[in-house]
C-alpha cells in the first residue's frame, strides 16, 4: 500500500471538478521526473518483496475463526518496535542463521531476535562474525542490515510487511530472504493477542458471512452499503473509505463480483443464494441485486473489501536504467498469468467453494469504477492485466499491442510535444485516461518540480499485473517495475521460493537477452485461463516457442503455441521442444558460479516450483479445496461452515509452525 496522505478528502461530486486539473499536473510531474532522471543509472539490480497477511482471531470454545479488527493497535506496536531497533545492524543475525542447520535452533534465534534484536546481536558479539553478505555500497541500506517494516492495508484485519531496505544483486542475497520473511512473521506474532494468528492466505474463507469479525459488527454501513461487509472492516485512514465510496458513486451503483459456484453433489441447483438479503431496502443500491447484479449459480459479492481485502505477494525490481525497466516490464508481462496459475490460492469466497482458484478477477471487479455506459467502450477495469508493451526494443513489434486501448488524447499530445516517445506516451496516456479517485483538498496545489502526488494519484490506482514506476523526486531510488499477479502462499518457504524464482527469471531474461514478446490478446487469454479450477492440469497457456536471441522471427504467427504449466516450467519432453523456464533459471544460476550452500538452498526453491508445475505437490488452492471437501462436517453442498473454517485455519497454522504437509510442500522443504 502506497504512502497515506493526511488531509481532507473530497467526495465524488467535489472530486469531479478537479479530475482534469490532477491529470494535467500529474503529467507535468511525470515530465519533470522523466527529464530529471532519464539519464540516471544504477550500478546494481535491487529488489524487494511485499507480503500481506490476515490476522485471525481464534475462539477455541465455540470453534470459530474470525478476522481481528485490531490493525491500528497492532501497527502502533509494530511501529514502536521499528523505531526502537532501527539502528540495530541485523547482519550478524542473518549470518548466524545462515550458519545454523538445526530447525529448532533457527526458530529459537528468530524468536529471540523478534523480541529484542539488540540484545541478541550484543550477546553474539555484534559485527564480529565475518560471514556477512557483501554490500556494494556501505552508504546504502541493505535488507540484511535493516529492521523490517510494517504497513497498513485496506482491510482492518490485514497487515503488510517488507524488508527494511532492498535486497542486493548477488545470489548470496537469496540465502536470507526466507529468514527475513520468517522474522517478520515472528515480530508480528509477538505483537498479537494470544488467540490471534498472522496467516499468509489469499482471503479469509468466510469473509462476509454472519459474525465473521472480532468484534462482531453488523453490515449496514453507508460507505460501501454492502449486504455482507460492515464498513468497520475498512482501514480507518480517510483514503480508504473515500476510495470505497467514490468508486461506488462514480459507477452509479455498487460494485458487483460474481464468481461461479462449485457444484457439488448436494449443492442447490439452480443456485439462488439464500444468504443474500434480497428484500433489504436500507439504501437505494440494495435494489442492485434484485435488478440483476447478483447472478444465479454464482457467489455474489458487493463491496470493495472482497477484492482489496485479499492478500498477495508482490515483487519490485529496480533496474539499471529507464530502458532496462521498460524492457523488464514487457518481458515479465507474459509471465504474470503463468505465476498467477502456479500460485493459485483462492478456492472459496464468502463461505462457499468456487469453481475457480484465483482472486484476480474479484479484485478487478471490486475497484471497477466504470459507469454502465463506459462498460461498452472501456474494455477493462482499472485493476486488470497489462494493456500495452512499452519498450523501444526492436523486438517489440507493433502487432503485439493488439487489444483496444483507451487513452487521454490531451495527455498523449502533451507527452509527444515534450519529446516522450510514442510507446511510453501511449502507456501514460492510457493510465491517465482514468479519473483520480481520491483527491485531498489540502493537496490540490503542488509544486510539480518537487512533488509527484498527482502523478501517483493515477499511477498507483491503475492496478495492472505489472507497474512501471519512475524514480520519486528527491531520492536515490531508480527506475522500477512491480510484478503484481502472484497470490500469497501459506508458508514463508513458499513465498521465498516464488519471489526468488521470479527474480532469477528476471535476471536470466536480461543476462540471456531472452525474447518473451507475444500478442497482448494472448496474455489476456492466459489470465482468464489462470483462474480456472486446477488450471495447472486443466488449461493450456500461450507462449513463445523459442525465446532465445538466435530464434528466427520470419514467421511470427508460428512463434506461439499453447503449452501446459508443466511444459512451460519443466520443459517439453521432445526434440526441439520448449526448454522450460526452470531450465533457463538453472542455466543462469550455474553461470554465476555460486558456492555449494547457495546452490543447495536455491535448488530447494526451484524444486518446489517444479513440483507445483508437474503436480507432485498441490497449489494452495487445491490443497485448501481438498481439506474442505474431505472434512467430516462437509455436506457436499459447497458450504464452508464455521467448523471447517476453524479446523482449516488451525491446520494452516500448524504447517506454518513446521508440521509440514508433503502434499502441499512436496519433498523440498
Curated annotation (Swiss-Prot):
Source taxonomy: Eukaryota, Fungi, Dikarya, Ascomycota, Taphrinomycotina
Species of origin: Schizosaccharomyces pombe (strain 972 / ATCC 24843)
Role according to the record: Catalyzes the ATP-dependent ligation of L-glutamate and L-cysteine and participates in the first and rate-limiting step in glutathione biosynthesis.
GO CC annotation, single: cytosol
Any one Gene Ontology molecular-function term assigned to this protein's record: glutamate-cysteine ligase activity
Similarity comment: family membership: Belongs to the glutamate--cysteine ligase type 3 family.
Name of the top EC class for this enzyme: ligase
Subunit description: Heterodimer of a catalytic heavy chain and a regulatory light chain.
Pathway in which the depicted protein is active: Sulfur metabolism; glutathione biosynthesis; glutathione from L-cysteine and L-glutamate: step 1/2
Identification of the protein by name: Glutamate--cysteine ligase
Gene that this sequence comes from: gcs1
Catalysed reaction equations from the record: L-cysteine + L-glutamate + ATP = gamma-L-glutamyl-L-cysteine + ADP + phosphate + H(+)
